[in-house]
From Swiss-Prot:
Binding site for Mg(2+): 43, 194
Keyword set includes Ion transport: no
Residue list for modification N6-(pyridoxal phosphate)lysine: 655
Site feature (Participates in the substrate recognition with KAPA and in a stacking interaction with the adenine ring of SAM) residues: 332
UniProt protein name: Bifunctional dethiobiotin synthetase/7,8-diamino-pelargonic acid aminotransferase, mitochondrial
Gene: BIO3-BIO1
Organism whose genome encodes this protein: Oryza sativa subsp. japonica
Amino acid sequence: MLRLLRHARRHSTSSSSSAAAAAVPLTSPAFAVFGANTGVGKTLVSAGLVASLLASPSPSPSTVAYLKPLQTGFPDDSDARFVFDRAPALLRRLRLAGGGASTRLVASNHTLFPSPAVDPLPERQDTVVNYGGEEGVEEKALVCRTVYAWREPVSPHLAAEREGMPVEDEEVRWLVDRWLAEEDGGGEVWKVLETAGGVASPGPSGTLQCDLYRSSRLPAVLVGDGRLGGISSTLSAYETLLLRGYDVGSVILEDRGLSNDRFLLSYLRKRVPVHVLPPIPEDPKDDLTDWFSESSSAFSSLKDSLQSFHSRRVQRLNSMQRKSKYLLWWPFTQHDLVPVDSVTVIDSRFGENFSAYKVKDKTIVPQFDACASWWTQGPDSNLQIELARDMGYAAARYGHVMFPENVHEPALRCAELLLGGVGKDWASRVYFSDNGSTAIEIALKMAFRKYACDHGIIVDSEKDIRSEGSVHFKVLALNGSYHGDTLGAMEAQAPSAYTSFLQQPWYSGRGLFLDPPTVYIKNKSANLSLPPSIMHDQLSSCDTCFSSLTEVFCKTRDTSSAANVYVSYISQQLSQYAMSNNSEHIAALIIEPVIQGAGGMHLIDPLFQRLLVKECKNRKIPVIFDEVFTGFWRLGVESASELLGCFPDISCYAKLMTGGIVPLAATLATEPIFEAFRSDSKLTALLHGHSYTAHPMGCTAAVKAIQWYKDPSTNSNIDLDRMKLKELWDSALVNHLSSLPNVKRVVSLGTLCAIELKAEGSDAGYASLYASSLIRQLREEDNIYARPLGNVIYLMCGPCTTQDSCTRQLAKVHRRLQKLN
């Protein structure tokens, strides 16, 4: 362990330090000691807890490991040395008082990385203490460590700056994770990590310590403040921890005669145990031996409550797989194909990673969320914390308020950002709803009304309807499309597994569905695939093969042979449909711009979609972009319309809009679309909504996420010159993947990298189980939580995910596919 930590700085000097995911065992308890302030007695509590643990009768921990990651004022002040010095003496007293077995304690204390300003350097301390008893000998160990130590007795961020020893957050986290993962031989091990200062005191980089240690999410022991004002600081610290997703196992504080403990016991009842310590002597000459003896019952009670907390936590985690199989009904899941032991138990999330509990091993393991939690997630760990804080504020300020005829700041600000971002230069109105499918239904209603007005189906200012019974509206859409699971949205998509009689017996498919040309990467080049329905005799290799996707998106292709073929095909299909369906009207075009998601992660030729939009606008057919999946930097730009080079009349957004943390959707529209609903009658208004329209929490989250994504000070992936994301997936690795013999195609764009495996017959398509073994290996051995679309596997990150992280995950997939060969 010591050698590992000494070499850690070599391996953990950048964000790539988290490359090797540490499995943290829950076979033994581990807690973090936080303080409501500095000087509240965190180290006294740590020492008392350690001594109580070592003195516990069997079964008791054979080893107690104490870690002080950050120490200032060193070596005059050393909390690890205090624990090392005091715990053995306290154990002797407790043993004399309680009897029991003879004990042999092996204790050590060491500082790993002292600042260059620390002089003289302290030596490692080792001691062996024997305590007599009436029974056999118990072997105990106390391992105390200080990781980073600075000389000046100031906040770590100041000490690091002044003494020239900066430490990155990832370095601290890496070391803590390795310490937690270390198992010291046989027997139970308790681990106690003591933080520095208060809950929100800065670490060496300036990151608050409650944020710095959040990745480990150790249950907290909160040392409260018994002084005047301590009630406020204790509760503030408690709520700060809760807001960041920590569990607080216990609160403990000194009785200073101000009844702080009585108030906290009352306020926190049924939430968390509160333990009270006797007053700490103020005489600096007092060695606190008598105080520790007097406090032994409080520390024993603290130890018992923490043990109970840990046992309840593990018991619940162990039961969740089995219970989920009998209580839950998962979407898009055939339960008979999911063994109980394959259910992923998610303890928490931190940035792009799940903390998954492995029931068999009883460990917590970070898993990269390669599904971006079903395409919604955008936050890194910093944005996650910001969203939690802002949403808490919105919930406390607004709760929920109804929206029609009302306005509140989160909704108004969100609308301003939407119109100035994804809706810039074309949209003027924002219609809020709850999710993507609902946003699509609203968009269809908007488009149909506009079409009816433009084509004389609705006449005069009263919106009288001509020949209502004989008018049938259909959509123009693409095969392979997917627009949601509500009935109206399903009618606007082509027949598929999602719309079959088994899933939607009412489905009729109200549209003309065209076969789209697609683009994919194979053998290091971008290739155009044309469906049989599109004639392509006129096309040469320069029309169907490209050196990169950049060429595919180039607008100079508008005058190419491919453009002529597309225009002819689109015009012919629309004309033929109009001639054969006199009473039916193509009243809207609806497309997923650039990428079809649920249909298999296909990249539709942007030239085809651009010309399709142009033709529909020429025919006064309203155009809907379904950007529920593609919007807000999913494809490397804020809106996929930037890639297409054209604007819709209506567009739908959700998922990434709120950072994925809470459902909210918006349908944006042009002013002419809005005008189609205006009159003196309420019956002509858009009568569609839900109880939580524009709910303040969702709008607040969207305001934060939308601004965060595009700000280079918060998102280092933004290329300011082009206002695009930097390339997140290593192009050389993508090309290597595309050249593997078992890979049919690769699509790499923005935050998405999709890989279709070569498969035939029933091994291909949505129902395929072809990728099951690969997915299992990625989850269980590579710590990547992936979920396939049949024989298509994909990795998806957030707009803020580092390039290093993307490269690591993609390299793991590459290695697996090589072995699969």
